[in-house]
Amino acid sequence: MTQYIPDTQRPIGLFDSGEGGLTVARAVADLLPQENLIYACDTAHFPYGPRPLAEVRAFFRRFMEFFVEQNCKLVIVACNTATAAAIDLLLADAFPIPALGVVQPGAAMAAEASVTGRIGVAATQGTCDSGIYPQTIRLFRPDAYVVQQACPILVIRAEEGVISGPEVRREVERCLAPILAERVDTLVLGCTHFPHMAKVIQDVVGPAVRLVDPGKATAVQVADLLRRRGLLNPGPGPGQRRAFTTGDPQRFLEVACRLWPGGVDAAAHIHLWSQQE
């Protein structure tokens, strides 16, 4: 007999190409520690940034099927590139369960945080090419000047669990130099891998530039949505945090333990395609 699980105790699903979305999972866990989380990442196809958005969109749709199978009550697309690829599906509520991305909350926070209206976005190539951040920021602040920069090397470093040190600092300096040359006062960490190295980034950009972590803004939006729908988990105690990966679960856990010590209870492999690339 299938065990009945109250709607409030159903898990929240989080999706990313790799370990980056753990920054969003951590933000949700900090704000809603009683919630059960299922983190699913597509490390078999990592990184998403250089891939065509149509391909990323297809990957995302398959993961949504997985989250439905896992009886999730809500899904967070903890990946900016996947959010850009599937934005029309998210806006149209095209799935059996609510799903929301990280771009809109991050864009709204950046528009509010900036004093001068000069906003930088560090992201993947796919996110930059989509134009989703400039478009969304200007919905909240039409006069905003937005400059973007793709930082693929930082995505790779964070996925490896290398988030500090002299070489990382040099790479951050090189990546962000074009943005800082535009005299921005706000920088959106437009890839969920980047908050893992927020301390180095803040040190490079200086105290006059405010960092915006879309994951934290998304966690607030998730809490509000669950509250309005009567789906907040009342507890007791901390929720379970399980991970699934299309890659090597042991490798995932090794890196996850460095990026979020104690944050993931267990990891397992999932095979979602008949033949993985």
UniProtKB/Swiss-Prot annotation:
Keyword Cell wall biogenesis/degradation on this protein? yes
Checking PROSITE patterns in the record gives: ASP_GLU_RACEMASE_1, ASP_GLU_RACEMASE_2
Q: Which domain of life is it from?
A: Bacteria
Q: Where substrate is bound, by residue?
A: 16-17, 48-49, 80-81, 192-193
The processes (GO biological process) annotated in the record are:
cell wall organization; peptidoglycan biosynthetic process; regulation of cell shape
* This protein's record includes keyword Isomerase: yes
Q: Per the UniProt record, which EC number(s) apply here?
A: 5.1.1.3
Quote the function comment for this protein: Provides the (R)-glutamate required for cell wall biosynthesis.
Q: What is this protein called?
A: Glutamate racemase
Q: Which organism is it from?
A: Symbiobacterium thermophilum (strain DSM 24528 / JCM 14929 / IAM 14863 / T)
Gene label: murI
